[in-house]
Each structure stands twice: as C-alpha cells, then as structure tokens.
C-alpha cells in the first residue's frame, strides 16, 4: 500500500470541500485492510508494518475530518509555511473583530445571553471561514491567502475553547 499524502491514501481528491461520508467510508476500507488483527499470525515485521499503516490511516482521518486541520494540511502540502507560532500578522479588520470578541468573552463570563450570543457569532465565523477556504483553495488555488485564513480560524477555535471553559456565573 503506497500513498504520498492523506488524500491519496483514501483515494480522494485533494480538496478542502470533502464529503464526510465518503471520507469515513474510505477510512473504514483502509483501516479494515491494515487492521493489526488481520496480521495476528504474520511475522513480527509484517505486524509492525500493519500497525504503522493503521496509525497512519487514523492520523490521516483525524486531520481530514476536521475542516480546520484539513485546510492547514492542504496549505502545508502546497508548501505554505503557516508559521503559527511566529507569524501573528493579520488583517486589521480581523484584529478589530478579535478585540470585540475578547470584550464579548468578558461579558459572557457573567451573562448567559452574552455567552449564547458569542457562541452563535463564533459558529457563524466558522461557517464563513469554511466558505472562504473552499473558495481560496478549491476554486482559486490561493494557498498563501488560505494560510492567512487558517491562522485566523485558529484564533476563532482558541476563543471558542475559552468560551466553553467560561460558563457564565448565574
């Protein structure tokens, strides 16, 4: 079994827009072929290779089923260094939005209505990110700009995690 990337491992096109049902079916087919139990009576080397393929299939599935990780993977495969730790440069409008969301997060800690409003706003931001990334990657092939959007999406996800941890005080 040879596959150069996660998409070819599952026989899927390298696209951001991906049918989750097709992805799961492809993963199940690959996982069934390389499941270590199928190699219980094989040599130690064959069992080790099966285990490595199973781990690879599981990791590929984990990355491809998460839209943000899939976008990140596609950008990296296209040679874009996302510099997630060092590159904090973002669009000024998005920076202003970040500040607004941070203020809303402070309110959300005290107010259930503010909590619900911010959660809904972040969900809308996720949907917009997915639409934008589908256009940038699948339609325009603009991986550099897609990388910028992935960094923005990472901020949205981090804020969503903080929101989940910040249940409003009743």
Curated annotation (Swiss-Prot):
GO terms for biological process: [2Fe-2S] cluster assembly; protein complex oligomerization; protein folding. One of its GO terms (molecular function) is protein-folding chaperone binding. The keyword Chaperone applies. CDD domains: DnaJ (cd06257). Residues 5-79 form the J domain. Disulfide bonds: none annotated. Pfam families: HSCB_C (PF07743). GO terms for cellular component: iron-sulfur cluster transfer complex. InterPro entries: DnaJ_domain, HscB, HscB_C_sf, HscB_oligo_C, J_dom_sf. Gene3D superfamilies: DnaJ domain, HscB, C-terminal domain. Keywords: Chaperone. It comes from the Bacteria. HAMAP family: HscB (MF_00682). Belongs to the HscB family. Co-chaperone involved in the maturation of iron-sulfur cluster-containing proteins. Seems to help targeting proteins to be folded toward HscA. Interacts with HscA and stimulates its ATPase activity. This is Co-chaperone protein HscB homolog. It comes from Bordetella parapertussis (strain 12822 / ATCC BAA-587 / NCTC 13253).
């Amino acid at each position: 079994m040879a596959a150069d990337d996660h998409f070819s491992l599952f026989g899927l096109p390298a696209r951001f827009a991906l049918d989750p049902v097709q992805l799961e079916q492809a993963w199940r087919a690959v996982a069934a072929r390389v499941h270590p139990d199928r190699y219980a009576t094989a040599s130690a080397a064959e069992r080790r290779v099966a285990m490595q393929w199973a781990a690879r299939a599981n990791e590929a599935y984990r990355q491809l089923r998460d839209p943000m990780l899939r976008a990140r993977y596609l950008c990296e495969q296209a040679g874009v260094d996302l510099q997630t730790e060092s590159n904090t440069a973002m669009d000024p409008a998005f920076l202003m939005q970040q500040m607004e969301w941070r203020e809303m997060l402070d309110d959300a800690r005290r107010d259930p209505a503010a909590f619900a409003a911010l959660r809904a706003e972040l969900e809308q931001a996720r949907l917009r990110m997915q639409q934008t990334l589908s256009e940038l990657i699948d339609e325009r092939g603009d991986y550099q700009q897609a990388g910028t959007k992935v960094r923005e999406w990472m901020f949205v996800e981090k804020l969503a995690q903080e929101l989940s941890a910040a249940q409003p005080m009743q």
